[in-house]
């Protein structure tokens, strides 16, 4: 555990996916107490939210100290985000690239909204550390996943709420293969297996097809990234 955070509480943005589960384990290995926040925004893959309880149980079973540290689980419903978005994550349309070079899975402002609500909740609960799974390395070009966006949000939220927030993004500079390795470093094969079997990444919400790397359609960008990362991780472990 880092001595710098050994007495602190963190709030983790926890969707039930691979990245956020890895970030949750990362936080549990560093902070004295960890709370989580998930969002129901009308996403097609809302099945990810149902995965969280199984992941909580699995994490508690992996390490007794993690069980002691896991605090309150929060869920916020923000259907307005889907109402104002015309994307493949919130509409039953095919996934494709847009004219602007971004995939139509991009939900404009999603991470900005998530971080704002997270900071508001953290403020009320006396928490200054917020952990998110944003990543610049293996991402689809989403502008709200960039490090400069996260740093700008940290400054804006700290100014706007007169509270010195620190936004932690442990996956920002690593790819999916390294994310699998990080999970192993944090919790061994037990955590890797838990993420494979219980987390959800597929944009289409497919839980009927199981692969070596987990459940999903196997075709969408999220599944492709997860599978590619898994294959590279397995090849080098």
Curated annotation (Swiss-Prot):
Q: How is the cofactor bound?
A: Binds 1 zinc ion per subunit.
Q: In which residues is Zn(2+) bound? A: 202, 217, 220, 223
Q: Which InterPro entries match?
A: QueC (IPR018317), Rossmann-like_a/b/a_fold (IPR014729)
Which metal ions or organic cofactors does this protein require, according to UniProt? Zn(2+)
**Keyword terms of this UniProt record:** ATP-binding, Ligase, Metal-binding, Nucleotide-binding, Queuosine biosynthesis, Zinc
UniProt EC number = 6.3.4.20
Q: What GO MF terms are annotated?
A: ATP binding; ligase activity, forming carbon-nitrogen bonds; zinc ion binding
What is catalysed by this protein?
A: 7-carboxy-7-deazaguanine + NH4(+) + ATP = 7-cyano-7-deazaguanine + ADP + phosphate + H2O + H(+)
SUPFAM superfamilies, alphabetized: Adenine nucleotide alpha hydrolases-like
Per the record, a Pfam family?
Answer: QueC
Q: Name the positions where ATP binds.
A: 14-24
Q: Which GO terms describe its biological process?
A: queuosine biosynthetic process
Query: Which pathway does the record list?
Result: Purine metabolism; 7-cyano-7-deazaguanine biosynthesis
Family, as annotated: Belongs to the QueC family.
Instruction: Name the NCBIfam families on file.
Output: 7-cyano-7-deazaguanine synthase QueC (TIGR00364)
Biological role stated in the UniProt entry: Catalyzes the ATP-dependent conversion of 7-carboxy-7-deazaguanine (CDG) to 7-cyano-7-deazaguanine (preQ(0)).
Please give the name of this protein. Answer: 7-cyano-7-deazaguanine synthase
What organism is the protein native to? Bradyrhizobium diazoefficiens (strain JCM 10833 / BCRC 13528 / IAM 13628 / NBRC 14792 / USDA 110)
């Amino acid at each position: 555990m880092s001595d710098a955070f050994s007495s602190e509480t963190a709030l983790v943005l926890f969707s039930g996916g691979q990245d956020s589960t890895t970030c949750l384990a990362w936080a549990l290995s560093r902070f004295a107490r960890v709370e989580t926040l998930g969002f129901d925004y009308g996403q097609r893959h809302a099945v990810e939210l149902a995965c969280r309880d199984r992941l909580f149980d699995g994490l508690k079973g992996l390490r007794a100290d993690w069980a002691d540290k896991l605090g309150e689980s929060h869920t916020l419903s923000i259907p307005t985000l889907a109402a104002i978005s015309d994307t493949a994550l919130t509409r039953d349309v095919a996934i494709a690239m847009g004219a602007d070079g971004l995939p139509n899975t991009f939900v404009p402002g999603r991470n900005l909204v998530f971080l704002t609500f997270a900071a508001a909740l953290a403020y009320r609960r006396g928490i200054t550390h917020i952990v998110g799974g944003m990543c610049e390395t293996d991402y689809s070009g989403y502008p709200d996943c960039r490090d400069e966006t996260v740093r700008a949000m940290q400054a804006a939220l700290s100014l706007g709420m007169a509270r010195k927030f620190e936004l932690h993004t442990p996956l920002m500079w690593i790819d999916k293969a390294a994310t699998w390795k990080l999970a192993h470093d944090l919790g061994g094969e037990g955590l890797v297996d838990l993420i494979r079997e219980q987390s959800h990444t597929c944009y289409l919400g497919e839980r009927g097809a199981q692969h070596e790397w987990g459940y999903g359609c196997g075709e969408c960008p999220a599944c492709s990234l997860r599978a590619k990362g898994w294959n590279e991780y397995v090849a080098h472990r």
